[in-house]
Every structure is written in structure tokens, then in C-alpha cells.
């Protein structure tokens, strides 16, 4: 693959994208790599990743990584984006808490009913044992 047949993917140079603005890197200037590929400046709003062989899988992974980085930057810089998500999560959490409280109340009610039935069963067993003890051995 030569510089002339480059498929158009934008790549980033290690030095220009990873050095902070105060380190003397030229800002807002489109550069190029050694083989002539375009390189965005370090303070560019887009972050792109280089693909080695240009396979469809690498291109898709590069695009996904770039989109994820852009989304992460957008979330960090746009707090208004987070507030509806936080309130939505809080309302879902509140709804879950309400459902859990209702389930715990039902469980408590069922536990009380089970205790009543267990006591009745114990009473019946005692009555059966008393009847067996009071009846003659061959009367059955």
C-alpha cells in the first residue's frame, strides 16, 4: 500500500496527538505522517485511530473507537446530557424500590400464613398422636 492508494481513513500521529497543547506542538494545523497520510492536530475535536491493514474489521473497529471517544468527550463536556439520564435512573430506582417493598410485604404476609398453617399442622399431629395413644392396640 502506497501513500497514493491510501483509502481515506484519517490517522493520528503519536507525537502530535498525545502531547498536550502546552508542550509546543503546533495547534490547529493539519499535518501528515511520513508516508503522506493526513494527521489531525492535537487539539482536534475528533480523535481517530490508525488502521494497519485497512481490513473491514479494522476499519469498523477504528470507527467504533472514534465514535466512542467522541461520545465520551461529549458526555464529559455536556452536563445537560447527563441530567435526564440521572433523573431517569433515579425514577427507575424508585420504581424498583417500590416493587421491592411490595414484594417484601407480600412475603411477610405469606410467612405469617405459613406460620398459622404450620401451627395447625402441629396441633393435628398432636391430636393424631393422642388418639393413637388412647386407642387399644388392636382396635384399628
UniProtKB/Swiss-Prot annotation:
The keyword Phosphoprotein applies. Keywords: Capsid decoration protein, Capsid protein, Coiled coil, Host nucleus, Host-virus interaction, Phosphoprotein, Virion, Virus entry into host cell. Induction: Expressed in the intermediate phase of the viral replicative cycle. Its main location: virion. Gene3D superfamilies: 6.10.250.3040. Homotrimer. Interacts with hexon protein; this interaction tethers the hexons together. Self-interacts with adjacent proteins. Interacts with kinesin light chain KLC1; this interaction leads to capsid disruption at the nuclear pore complex during virus entry into host cell. This protein is only encoded by mastadenoviruses, and may therefore play a role in mammals tropism. Belongs to the adenoviridae hexon-interlacing protein family. Structural component of the virion that forms triskelion structures consisting of three molecules that stabilize three hexon trimers at the center of each icosahedral facet and fixes the peripentonal hexons. Dispensable for assembly. During virus entry, recruits the anterograde motor kinesin-1 to the capsid docked at the nuclear pore complex thereby subjecting the docked capsid to a pulling force. The resulting tension leads to capsid disruption, dispersion of capsid fragments toward cell periphery and eventually viral DNA entry into the host nucleus. Three N-terminal domains of hexon-interlacing protein form triskelions between hexon capsomers. This is Hexon-interlacing protein. It comes from Human adenovirus C serotype 2 (HAdV-2). The lineage of its organism: Viruses, Varidnaviria, Bamfordvirae, Preplasmiviricota, Tectiliviricetes.
Amino acid at each position: 500500500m502506497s501513500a497514493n492508494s491510501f483509502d481515506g481513513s484519517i490517522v493520528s500521529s503519536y507525537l502530535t496527538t498525545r502531547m498536550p497543547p502546552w508542550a509546543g506542538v503546533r495547534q490547529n494545523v493539519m499535518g501528515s505522517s511520513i508516508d503522506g497520510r493526513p494527521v489531525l492536530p492535537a487539539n482536534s475535536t475528533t480523535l481517530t485511530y490508525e488502521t494497519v491493514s485497512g481490513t473491514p474489521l479494522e476499519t469498523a473497529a477504528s470507527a467504533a473507537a472514534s465514535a466512542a471517544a467522541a461520545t465520551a468527550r461529549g458526555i464529559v463536556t455536556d452536563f445537560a446530557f447527563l441530567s435526564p439520564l440521572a433523573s431517569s435512573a433515579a425514577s427507575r430506582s424508585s420504581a424498583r424500590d417500590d416493587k421491592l417493598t411490595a414484594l417484601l410485604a407480600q412475603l411477610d404476609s405469606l410467612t405469617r400464613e405459613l406460620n398459622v398453617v404450620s401451627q395447625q399442622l402441629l396441633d393435628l399431629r398432636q391430636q393424631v398422636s393422642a388418639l393413637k395413644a388412647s386407642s387399644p392396640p388392636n382396635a384399628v
